[in-house]
Amino acid sequence: LVYIPFWRPDIERPESIVGEGWRFYGFGRLLRHLPERSIKPAPKNERRELKQRIRQRLSRAGANEVLTYSFVHGRVLKNSEQDPGRAYRLSNALSPDLQYYRISILPSLLDKVHANIKSGHDEFMLFEIGKIHDKKLGFNDENLPIEKTFIDGVYANKKPKAGAPFYKVRKIAERLMKDLSVEVDFVKIAESDSDVPAPFDAKRSAWIVAKNGDNLGIVGELVSSARRNFKLPDYTAAFSIDIEKLQENLSKNQGYNYQPLSRFPSTARDISLKMDSNVDYAKVYACAEEVAKKHGELQMSITPIAIYQPKNNDSTKTVTLNVKFTSAERTLEDKDIAPIIEEIAAMAAEEFDAAQV
């Protein structure tokens, strides 16, 4: 124990006692360098890095990020066909326009589309990363409402283009997943599925499903009532992705998908398959992809070209795919490619009675 004499009232803290010890020992005998200490960089925040990567990818695709309030008016919920009863209502709202916690981000984005079109922007895409609160999610261990993080986006074009807007947004979502090295499938929504979030149209939407079966989100067009309520153009589609589930699948796919460019030229072939009109395009693509996996020595990319259906015969359709071949060892010849095209045609004929035309 150390006792402080009564004539030293200046010693009040433990640091003063240490200073006295060094005074007796001699300050001149102190080592002239700083004491060693372990310095570690701050750990990376994986969630923050994922959000930044998403922002960069969507910005490169031409999308614009917006920030909106987490509180919305009840009118916004009703216009998007959402149930206000699922939203938490504030007892001391700052204004009537900020009464409810939003249960999804998409309505906040839809509310901004018409104003941008009136400002002269005919074609654009908006996205936002934010949190949602839904009574269906329940409470956490601290008895607080569970909040989830989503990335929602909407594409709008005042001047309609050929084809459906679904494919435009799906292409953007598909590219985003590919850049993040997350393999997904776009699965058709069953008629009996009642979990389709408003305001998506179940008949014109698809689930975004990871390879392990996790439902990451949804991409598709909106119901006509929501388009009418928000004064949206007909050529409008959107997507909504759960960032927490996306991060879980991202951690399982940490490997890089980089492949060095081949020194040899690529070559491509088209294949047209005539089949029953009830056969889904996804089955045709999966058939070609399965054949491609058997030939791992080649880099093969499959791109849809067209789906043709005669006006006078709606019982059949013709699907055309473009298959691109690349070898890292040599220049490919027709004798290398023709058997693979024939193999795709044979598998399609076996699985859904398709004929090569």
Specify the residue positions occupied by each region the protein language model found:
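A glycine-rich phosphate-binding loop feature that marks nucleotide/adenosyl-phosphate handling sites
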Residues: 1-5, 35-41, 68-80, 125-135, ...
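Beta-strand scaffold of nucleotide-dependent catalytic cores
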Residues: 15, 128-129, 138, 218-220
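A carboxyl-terminal module marker
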Residues: 10, 14, 68, 146, ...
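Flexible glycine-/small-residue-rich
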Residues: 4-6, 92, 131, 155, ...
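Extended, well-folded interaction surfaces typified by the phenylalanyl-tRNA synthetase beta subunit core
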Residues: 1-124, 324-326, 331, 336-357
